[in-house]
Amino acid sequence: MKFTKADWTETNGTHLQGYMQAYYHELVEVFGEPEAGGDKTTVEWCLAFEDGTVATIYDWKEYETPMGSHQWHIGGKSKQAVHAVTSTFKETSNA
């Protein structure tokens, strides 16, 4: 599924919807470089998908950005965010 980088106005009001297991470098390959983290994250991807779904991928309460295999949080306004992120990840990383 096609996506663009979203800004904070689009991701405002998102919250935890699910998780995905991945390496940091895999997320960078699929979704590009992340934004700097906020109060309780070190990095975050903010994404707007072509179907209107908005999603975030982030670590939570980590002291350093996880580089190994990690259970990343997926935020959104509905469970569709999890589907959009995981299906795009699988499609792109298997290509």
Please state what every model-predicted region is.
Residues 1-95:
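Residues within mature, well-folded domains
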